[in-house]
Amino acid sequence: MARREEETKEFEERVVTINRVAKVVKGGRRFRFTALVVVGDKNGRVGFGTGKAQEVPEAIKKAVEAAKKDLVVVPRVEGTTPHTITGQYGSGSVFMKPAAPGTGVIAGGPVRAVLELAGITDILSKSLGSNTPINMVRATINGLQNLKNAEDVAKLRGKSVEELYN
């Protein structure tokens, strides 16, 4: 039991959306709840998950478990992203641009949750296209996955970091 308590303290979780869905059967409608949750340690690891259940707390619990299974490591430079990136999923895209220290997280709804839990403190972002919460979260995580540090790029090119900037 103590191990589970430690595990939950490691990650902060944020519920992005809860949706009531209905299945129409012969006797009427059967309602269930879906939950979209983002988890992160505010230190470069973030993930999202969805859960569906008869009750809201149960759906959230399932979503948190799913989110912890699929974490992404986000490269950061002084609290922001190393470079400008656009993440895409479906018809939704999220444009993210590094910002100067003190700017804060300029992002809307689901995108803000992902960026804050990833530990990014200064960033400018704009959501384009589809604004469905799940698509926004997936597009944001897609963009964060495609980020590269200067060290990684230098290694891929077989050069030193100093040579990249000259």
UniProtKB/Swiss-Prot annotation:
Gene3D superfamilies: 3.30.160.20, 3.30.230.10. Belongs to the universal ribosomal protein uS5 family. GO terms for biological process: translation. With S4 and S12 plays an important role in translational accuracy. The N-terminal domain interacts with the head of the 30S subunit; the C-terminal domain interacts with the body and contacts protein S4. The interaction surface between S4 and S5 is involved in control of translational fidelity. Transmembrane segments: none annotated. Signal peptide: none annotated. InterPro entries: Ribosomal_Su5_D2-typ_SF (IPR020568), Ribosomal_uS5 (IPR000851), Ribosomal_uS5_bac-type (IPR005712), Ribosomal_uS5_C (IPR005324), Ribosomal_uS5_N (IPR013810), Ribosomal_uS5_N_CS (IPR018192), Ribsml_uS5_D2-typ_fold_subgr (IPR014721). Keywords: Ribonucleoprotein, Ribosomal protein, RNA-binding, rRNA-binding. The gene is rpsE. The keyword Ribosomal protein applies. GO terms for molecular function: rRNA binding; structural constituent of ribosome. Residues 11-74 form the S5 DRBM domain. Part of the 30S ribosomal subunit. Contacts proteins S4 and S8. PROSITE patterns: RIBOSOMAL_S5, S5_DSRBD. GO terms for cellular component: small ribosomal subunit. HAMAP family: Ribosomal_uS5_B. This is Small ribosomal subunit protein uS5.
